[in-house]
């Protein structure tokens, strides 16, 4: 019987999840809360804050949803999956205890240390003075300072000198830029090498990695400017060879799942591994307890299997018997952002070039809505820092990148900002073999 599904969140990632779920024959009525303007073309939207666990769970119970996909990190960390389970509604995503793998950097670093999972050397602190004493004593730059808790993907500072480190410590620990997330910090060594994002499905027993991807975090071309939630992605990541994939499975993926089980908090859902391929081998930079944004916008378009079946298998512990297959092709996503993002930007700018939220007549192009709204007169307008993600799929990455940019040119709004070099590093790596 077709399932009535609720997706919790309201960005490009959630839009990509909804579009993939809708391909499943078991997917019936689909809702998104809070959703956004562009998502409302694909799902019914209900304006409930993703972090309002009580209201969301009451809504899910009242509407009798068969399955809930909790796609955003904050509600997972707040225990939304536990609260849904308490009223008998199955959900995709880790419970509160397992979500700590992302919600607390201290927890995840200590987990890796205890179970021998390769990661950067680190120390944890709750006293700002001691942080600076340690950094001065080490005398090694750049140094990485991370807020312990969730910080919208912006709680990681790479400091080139003592002054930057002191400013960073003040910002996180004293000025409380990220609130209680900055009560503790992790200080770690700066690693070098290509970065790889690997999202994986897990039921707490087996891990089935998705196709690898490459994110572009900085706001401007040539990886300059401020860190953002991500300005574009490509998949697969050419640096992630079959040999490296096998090494990661043996030394990182399975050991992480076993470690969580040993700690009494088995992880079910999407576990995202942020990896760096260092001269000493792959190391974990970060874990996320959910799909990445905008990685999801290139990974799920390449999924050939039934996403709803895979998700329910993760929830039910039957992933070993469930097919997870990706196409051999490639995908590229270019983010169209509001000028001034990630600092100050205006909202409410009319968007032109789209029909019902999509580019008309483009077979292999999908527009995912991150921050859009529909006004009372039906105009699609900007409503966030990252506005749209334009994804192209093609047999080869070169074509995917070219087509994503060609499609992006057809969309416009005032003060639109995009990077012009998404995928160039990956294409260079392919060219160099």
What is the meaning of each model-derived region?
Residues 92-155:
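A conserved helix-loop-beta module that forms one wall/lid of the active-site cleft
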Residues 249-271, 288-362, 375:
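Active-site "cap" helix and flanking loop/linker of ATP-utilizing ligase/carboxylase catalytic domains
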Residues 46-52, 123-127, 159:
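Short acidic-hydrophobic, aromatic-tinged amphipathic segments that line or gate anion-handling sites
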Residues 23, 38-40, 62, 92, ...:
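Solvent-exposed alpha-helices and their adjacent loops that cap or buttress functional pockets
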Residues 372-376, 381-433:
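Generic C-terminus detector
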Residues 1-96:
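ATP-binding N-terminal substructure of ATP-dependent carboxylate-amine bond-forming enzymes
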Residues 155-296:
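Internal nucleotide-binding/catalytic subdomain
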